[in-house]
Amino acid sequence: MNSLKFQSVFDIIGPVMIGPSSSHTAGAVRIGKIVSSIFGEEPKEVEFQLFNSFAKTYRGHGTDLALVAGILGMDTDDPRIPDSLKIAHERGIRIVWSIQKESNAPHPNTTTITVKNDHKTISVTGISIGGGNIQVTELNGFAISLNMNTPTIIIVHQDVPGMIAHVTEALSRYDINIAQMNVTREKAGEKAIKIIEVDSRSCEAAIEDIRKIPHLHNVNFFK
């Protein structure tokens, strides 16, 4: 029998959170918040495709509230999570649900989130694997593998020459090692998304330097 390996007790019992299930609420909040960070703007419409277990229990376990809360930028312990749908409505964000109770999704707690406004659309697939832990498996049709258990920097920027060099130079100045980097773009010269996993949890000074780089729209750091 294969043994399961956990990095900490929180992989088993989950984080401090609002809601009954770390998989269906805490993980869902984290997925939504990651998608919000990648999008980097106020959305006008968000479509949630829910598969298998997510689809069957999304209302009873509060997965719907958790996903929307994440899109609104809330954390797992935010007391406003039960009101997230109301808050989204007040902000003029249209929420659409696509329920797929039976599918061939590789994990039962899978969602594909499509976020739109007048300028752009992105699509992200994420899974909640337990204890509030998540994996991001697809971004705009590109297969990626991010577990978000390591410190991660998400940068939205204009697709211009030298951007990768500017960012890596900023990290190098503070002796921050890059473990993995994924870069995708809408098309040449348009907005691009850079997702960087690093070995250090102390990146605040480097992040401030990165924010000063021209043609950069949004930077978020997840410890």
For each feature predicted by the language model, list its residue ranges.
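Short glycine/threonine-rich loop-to-helix capping motif typified by GTGT followed
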Residues: 57-65, 110, 191-197
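Conserved phosphate/anionic-ligand binding catalytic regions in large, soluble enzymes, centered on
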Residues: 14-32
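Histidine-anchored nucleotide/phosphate-binding helix
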Residues: 32-38
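A conserved regulatory-domain signal marking ACT and ACT-like small-molecule sensing domains
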Residues: 95-97, 104, 121-223
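Contiguous domain-boundary segments centered on the initiation and propagation of an alpha-helix
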Residues: 72-118
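Acidic-glycine-rich active-site phosphate/pyrophosphate-binding loop
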Residues: 1-9, 40-44
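Gly-rich Lys/Arg/Thr-decorated short loops/hinges at beta-loop-alpha junctions or inter-strand turns
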Residues: 9-13, 146-149
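A structural-propensity feature for long, helix-poor, extended segments
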Residues: 47, 51-90
